[in-house]
Amino acid sequence: MKAIILAAGQGSRLGHMTDDRPKCLIEFNGRSLLDRQLDTLDTNGVSEAVVVTGFHDELVNAAIDRRRSAGQGPIVRTVFNPFYKVADNLGSLFLVRDELNGDCLVWNGDTLVSRSLMAKVVSNSGRDGICVTIDRKDSYDEDDMKVVRDIDSGRLRAIGKRLAKGVNAESIGLLAFRGDGGARFADAIEREMRTPEGTTVWYLRVIHYLAQHSEVWTLDISGDEWGEVDFPEDVERAEALVKRWDEAREAKAA
């Protein structure tokens, strides 16, 4: 399995923390967000990763070179997105659309997930096509990527931040593609990028469009831990989260 990590953005909503480094290189308990994502993939048998870079790409490349020199997996390639300042994340995926073949993941570069959560995503091989990893909670705010899905079947019916009716889950920023799912997504990305508004579109809008006329599935990981780093207040929560994960692994290894 291969993973595509979208890490081109600066993360300007984090203020001075990203003045001179991209969001994916912020450290949590001594390791960068990107390192932790790659560690999680490697632990779960994902052998290859493609990291889409943009803001201060030279720092990301240097971080990956250090991993490579230390013999740390997975095998990583980078693709530079020169349009990261003017195009949304659909532009990043457009540049790597040919990578959307076979079994692959698309992972937002600002999301941390537990290794057990990733194990569920990687092992969910019984569901071909496109599968959006979702969580559930009592209420959803305006910044959540909200989801409407069929409870019984798990089929996704709608996804977007502006959904108002029927919301019963949120996307955590991790998608899996199997069978023809990647090819369907790649074709839809290319169609959308040919429209006047293509560069302003989030890739999950394309997933929403696909769900209106074809099957898109969800994987409910409620109970597993994850965190998104978007705002300054998220950093403290993410730090506490990864410390807990690290301490649990250390205790298990002792």
Identify the function of each model-found stretch.
Residues 73-145:
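Conserved beta-loop-beta/alpha segment of the NTase-like Rossmann-fold superfamily
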Residues 13, 59-62, 116, 184, ...:
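Phosphate- and divalent-cation-binding pockets in alpha/beta enzyme and binding domains
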Residues 20-35:
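Short catalytic helix/loop segments, enriched in acidic residues and glycine
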Residues 1-3, 168-254:
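Conserved alpha/beta core of the MobA/IspD/sugar-nucleotide pyrophosphorylase nucleotidyltransferase superfamily
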Residues 1-18, 252:
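N-terminal nucleotide-binding beta1-loop-alpha1 segment
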Residues 25, 147-149, 218:
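A structural signal for short hydrophobic beta-strand segments in well-ordered beta-sheet cores
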Residues 114-194:
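Conserved core of the sugar-phosphate nucleotidyltransferase
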Residues 2-5, 31-103, 195, 253:
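Conserved N-terminal catalytic core of the sugar/cofactor nucleotidyltransferase
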